[in-house]
C-alpha cells in the first residue's frame, strides 16, 4: 500500500497514556511476532533508528519525556511520522519505546502501532472494526469532552497497540504499562542523550493542549 506523502509531526502523536484498555484475546501469530522482532532488532541502536526516520518528539509535549504512572512505565517514544497512515504492518511500527536503566542507558523494550481513526474509517467505512495485529485489536483513544471532537491532546482520535517485543511485561505483552521498568534513570539518560535534554519523568495526564502540525515531506 502506498504511504501518504504527508506526515504528522511528533506533536501530533499521542499515546493511550491515560488508562489501560482491554484488547482482543485471539492468540498472537508467532510468525508476525517473529517478523516484528526481526524488523526492529537493529533499532536497539538509537542512531540506526534515527537514520531510519524515527525521532523523539520536541521538548514541551508529553511524549518528549519518559512516560510513567502508577500502573507502570512506557518510556521514551521515538516516532516515525512517515509511517502514520492506514497501513498496518508488523514490520513497520510507528513508534519505538525505549526505557532507561539506572545508568541512563536506553534499551528498546516495545514497539507501538498507531492508526488515526478518521483515515481508517474513510478507507474501511464508518464504524469499521479497529485495526488489529498479532490477534489483538488496537485500542481507540476517543474524543474528549470540550475538545471539539479531538482527543484530550487536541488531535484527532486514533487507535494504538503497544507490543513488548524486547522486554517482558508482567501485565501482558500488549499492555501499555510495564511495571517491571521505570523512569528512575531518566535524568541520567538526559545527560547521555542530547535528544532528551533536561526532562522530568511524569504521567502523561489529561492536561495541556497541543496543536496538530501537518506538513509535506518536502516542506
Regions found by a protein language model. Give the residues of each.
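Intrinsically disordered, low-complexity sequence elements enriched in Ser/Thr/Gly/Pro
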Residues: 1-3, 16, 35, 40
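Bacterial N-terminal signal peptides that target proteins for export
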Residues: 1-11
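Bacterial N-terminal signal peptides
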Residues: 10-21
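Signal peptide processing junction and immediate N-terminal pro/mature segment
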Residues: 22-28
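Primary mode marks residue(s) on the alpha4-beta5-alpha5 output face of response regulator receiver
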Residues: 28-219
Amino acid at each position: 500500500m502506498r504511504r501518504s506523502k504527508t506526515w504528522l509531526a511528533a506533536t501530533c502523536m499521542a499515546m493511550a497514556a491515560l488508562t489501560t484498555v482491554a484488547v482482543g484475546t485471539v492468540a498472537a501469530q508467532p510468525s508476525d511476532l517473529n517478523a516484528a522482532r526481526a524488523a526492529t532488532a537493529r533499532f536497539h541502536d538509537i542512531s540506526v533508528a534515527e537514520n531510519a526516520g524515527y525521532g523523539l518528539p520536541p521538548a514541551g509535549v508529553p511524549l518528549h519525556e519518559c512516560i510513567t504512572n502508577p500502573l507502570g512505565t512506557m518510556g521514551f517514544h521515538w516516532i516515525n511520522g512517515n509511517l502514520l497512515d492506514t497501513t498496518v504492518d508488523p514490520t513497520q511500527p510507528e513508534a519505538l519505546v525505549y526505557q532507561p536503566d539506572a545508568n541512563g542507558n536506553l534499551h528498546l523494550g516495545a514497539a507501538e502501532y498507531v492508526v488515526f481513526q478518521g483515515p481508517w474509517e474513510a478507507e474501511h467505512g464508518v464504524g469499521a472494526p479497529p485495526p488489529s495485529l498479532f490477534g489483538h485489536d488496537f485500542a481507540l483513544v476517543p474524543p474528549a469532552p470540550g475538545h471539539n471532537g479531538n482527543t484530550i491532546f487536541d488531535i484527532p482520535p486514533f487507535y494504538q497497540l503497544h507490543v513488548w517485543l524486547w522486554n517482558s511485561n508482567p501485565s501482558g505483552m500488549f499492555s501499555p504499562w510495564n511495571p517491571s521498568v521505570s523512569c528512575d534513570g531518566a535524568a541520567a539518560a538526559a545527560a547521555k542523550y542530547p535528544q532528551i535534554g533536561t526532562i522530568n519523568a511524569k504521567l502523561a495526564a489529561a492536561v495541556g493542549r497541543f496543536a496538530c502540525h501537518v506538513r509535506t515531506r518536502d516542506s
